[in-house]
Curated annotation (Swiss-Prot):
NCBIfam families for this protein: pth
Keyword RNA-binding: yes
Lineage, uppermost ranks: Bacteria, Pseudomonadati, Pseudomonadota, Alphaproteobacteria, Rickettsiales
A GO CC term attached to the entry: cytoplasm
Stated name of the protein: Peptidyl-tRNA hydrolase
Species: Anaplasma marginale (strain St. Maries)
Known catalytic reactions: an N-acyl-L-alpha-aminoacyl-tRNA + H2O = an N-acyl-L-amino acid + a tRNA + H(+)
Domain of life: Bacteria
Enzyme class name: hydrolase
Site residues (Discriminates between blocked and unblocked aminoacyl-tRNA), renumbered to this chain: N9
Length: 186
């Protein structure tokens, strides 16, 4: 089984914020692949289904971002899922809005959710970095906790990620990125 983790903060007040773009992708994948309703487990909202030929558990930690690692560790430990079979979808202020990059391992670039996951399971999991840009003025924390100006474009990108996710899960990272870029340009 694969673990697909969408990072975000719980609560309606954070629903449309940049920090919650991981939740948007997780919800979109669950809908697009007809996963059952999310249930509470492992300090998270969890749903298990299939993404193409891949059995997957989608996890949305029910803790705040800086404590996401606990939920990921519980789900991964319970199902004996190694870090290499975990993919985390998260916001990245170092990328322009709408840019998507994928990597395995590496540093957390100051992202508190990734820092928490690194401490819990190590850093060899896959990361799908979802660009939310940096503010021209003001604080970064204020920026990522503010709502998207164009939430429709975020939902469109989430659907493109979902539509091409099997490429990524099959190990074709370049094909996945190529299709996202091509689709996103349309």
């Amino acid at each position: 089984m694969l673990l697909l983790v969408g990072l975000g903060n719980p609560g309606k007040q954070y629903e449309f914020t940049r920090h919650n773009v991981g939740f948007v992708v997780a919800d979109t994948v669950a809908r697009d692949f007809n996963f059952p309703e999310f249930s509470s487990k492992y300090d998270a909202l969890v749903s298990v289904g299939n993404v193409g030929l891949h059995r997957a558990m989608i996890v949305k930690p029910a803790t705040f971002m800086n404590r996401s690692g606990a939920a990921v560790l519980k789900a991964a430990s319970m199902h004996k899922i190694p870090a290499e079979q975990i993919t985390v979808f998260h916001d990245d202020a170092d990328l322009q809005h709408g840019v998507v990059k994928v990597k395995q391992g590496g540093g957390n670039a100051g992202h508190n959710g990734l820092r928490s996951i690194d401490a819990a399971i190590g850093c060899q999991y896959w990361r799908v970095r979802l660009g939310v840009g940096r503010p021209d003025v003001g604080s970064l924390s204020g920026h990522v906790l503010s709502d998207f100006h164009d939430f429709d474009s975020v939902q469109q990108l989430a659907h493109k990620i979902s539509a091409n996710l099997t490429e990524l899960l099959d190990g074709n990272v370049n094909g996945f990125i190529s299709k996202i870029r091509c689709d996103h340009a349309q």
